[in-house]
């Protein structure tokens, strides 16, 4: 491949991602950046099968949904990265893609999802406790709360209910048991039913 930057955006399953990386790193141009669009899997897990040289060129570029309308992009770096490449990638994403770009450390959910997924889970949990309809919940937990006009349930659906289930599993695995996120990370019966 002749690309300067290759973005992996497959399902949130580490086994599939590792197989893809094996193929990408065999074919890529030497020195090109390879990134994952994961929303929750730590870079240390994603890169565990990469060589030290490959790790220098690997990072996470987490684009928020809907990508066309959401300005935020998180670049998650590791201690292995060539920081000049990360800086160049950030500049490209800001100037050429028009993204508001944050450089993040490798923490569960990075920055945006650590806050955003928690807020979505709290909103959905409270909506069910209050016996709100989905429409009522989306009216309250939408634009007035800084969530896209889809509202919280609409956003959950837009992201992908099955993807959100994988994200929650990743958070549950990575966060300590006493973390407040664990209180709201349990499956919501309606969501579970929709996945089945």
Where in this protein do the model-derived segments appear?
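N-terminal glycine-rich phosphate-binding loop for ADP-containing cofactors
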Residues: 1-196
